[in-house]
């Protein structure tokens, strides 16, 4: 399994709206359509208001990279720009099974 984390800083006053949008069919539904998709979660910091991580899991690194290269990832990130207070950062991880 392969995991991808998108680290973000959200405007603390818009976290509820960002969470609702993240969990919407428009966002989470679009991810579910991708080959190799397993799950996605929005992790919200309990220590730093507005700090969040979008965690997605994929069957393989190739599936995660195909999702990113398809343009779907950039499209979804662009929809979150109104909520961001800084640039998003993407990182990838192997998950030993």
Q: Over which residues does each language-model region extend?
A:
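Short S/T/G/P-rich N-terminal loop/turn motif that feeds into the first structured element of a domain
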Residues: 1-52, 59-71, 85-97
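Short, conserved catalytic or adaptor-binding loops enriched in Gly and charged residues
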Residues: 80-84
């Amino acid at each position: 399994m392969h995991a991808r984390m998108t680290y973000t800083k959200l405007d603390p006053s818009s976290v509820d709206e960002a969470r609702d949008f993240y969990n919407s069919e428009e966002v989470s539904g679009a991810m579910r359509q991708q080959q190799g998709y397993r799950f996605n979660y929005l992790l919200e910091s309990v220590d730093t208001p507005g700090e969040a991580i979008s965690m997605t899991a994929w069957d393989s690194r190739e599936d995660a990279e195909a999702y990113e290269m398809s343009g779907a990832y950039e499209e979804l990130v662009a929809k979150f720009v109104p909520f961001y207070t800084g640039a998003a950062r993407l990182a990838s991880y192997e998950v030993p099974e």
